[in-house]
Amino acid sequence: MILYLHGFDATSPGNHEKIRQLQFIDKDVRLLSYSTLHPKHDMQHLLNEVSKQLKLTDDSEPIIIGVGLGGYWAERIGYLNGLKSVLINPNLTPQDNMLGKIDRPEEYSDIANKCVSEFREKNSGKSLVILSRNDDTFDNQVVSDELSRFYEICWDEEQPHKFPVLASQLPRIQAFKKG
């Protein structure tokens, strides 16, 4: 089972296309939708949804995949549920770069302060990070510098921020899921 978390643009038709692409790895891909506007509510909602989905699968190695803001949640929700995660162009600092886009961006700081301290050290090796060199939204070198001590970093030379075509990364994601 693959749990897929969309980015900030929840209604993008690209989400459906990514789900179709991920079905080449696992036929059971489930979209977990969330508001993107209310971080504390989103966190509780996602924790409940993941817990529910885990009870409904017999997959011994489910993973959670998120793009952009979904990558922020995939890392945290994956850690809290003991799941491997794939972070595609993750938004590491929504409290800084979501100002004016969501109602309460400061809630992200509050979530970070309440999270398990040093969770990345405890989650080391359990996330795969895929970064676009052509990301038009984030400076992914900064993301790489932040995460490379904990997770494998894979660079993509072609895709933009929303990563519409996963094809070149599917074998890597599949190996990570099974490994």
UniProtKB/Swiss-Prot annotation:
Q: Which SUPFAM superfamilies match?
A: alpha/beta-Hydrolases
Which parts pass through the membrane? none
InterPro entries assigned:
AB_hydrolase_fold (IPR029058), UPF0227 (IPR022987), UPF0227/Esterase_YqiA (IPR008886)
Annotated signal peptide? none
Q: Which NCBIfam families match?
A: PRK04940.1
Which family is annotated? Belongs to the UPF0227 family.
What is the protein's name according to its record?
UPF0227 protein Swoo_1808
Organism for this UniProt entry: Shewanella woodyi (strain ATCC 51908 / MS32)
